[in-house]
């Protein structure tokens, strides 16, 4: 066997892990449908490292509220949904205080859309909409999420405005 015949498989074996690593580290792409909808709605946004859309809204009384429209979708059977997130509370310890956790559970029960979830040290309102929602439907989900989350933030933090 010629030495060059052994060289090709060796080079190929060395190149494959590097190519796989490049694929793993490539940033997820932002959903073009969501981008077009947000632009049509006139919303300013930035795309984060996960490929999600980060929006900041000015609200009444000088308050502001953060929202994310997640590019990736979730599926269950024939359903495909997209999430709109809006944070409202950050805990300082390992767990939410009991009164805060109970208030979030109560709000999840009585709310019209979405539910409160724990995301690391934050309470986040997550509203799920059809992945193919219209611009108007996405707008309604965003509006609901930011207003409800801002109200909960004001309630739980005595009027602070972190998000």
Regions inferred by a protein language model and the residue ranges of each:
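A mature extracytoplasmic/lumenal domain signature
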Residues: 49-51, 59, 71-73, 85-88, ...
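Short, internal acidic amphipathic alpha-helical interface segments
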Residues: 81-122
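N-terminal secretory signal peptides
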Residues: 21-77
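Bacterial N-terminal signal peptides that target proteins for export
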Residues: 1-8
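Soluble non-cytosolic domains of exported or imported proteins
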Residues: 25-32, 95, 132-139
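Short, highly charged C-terminal tails/helix-capping segments
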Residues: 157-163
């Amino acid at each position: 066997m010629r030495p060059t015949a052994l060289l090709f498989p060796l080079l190929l074996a060395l190149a494959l892990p590097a190519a796989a690593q490049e694929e793993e580290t490539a940033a997820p792409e932002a959903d073009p449908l969501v981008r077009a909808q947000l632009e049509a709605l006139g919303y300013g946004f930035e795309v984060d490292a996960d490929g999600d859309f980060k929006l900041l809204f000015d609200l009444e009384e000088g308050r502001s509220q953060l929202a994310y429209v997640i590019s990736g979708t979730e599926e269950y059977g024939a359903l495909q949904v997209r999430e709109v997130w809006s944070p409202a509370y950050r805990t300082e310890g390992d767990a939410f205080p009991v009164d805060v956790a109970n208030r979030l559970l109560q709000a999840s029960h009585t709310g019209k859309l979405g539910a409160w979830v724990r995301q690391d040290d934050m309470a986040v309102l997550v509203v799920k909409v059809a992945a193919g929602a219209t611009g108007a439907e996405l707008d309604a989900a965003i509006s609901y999420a930011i207003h409800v989350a801002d109200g909960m933030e004001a309630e739980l933090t005595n009027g602070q405005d972190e998000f």
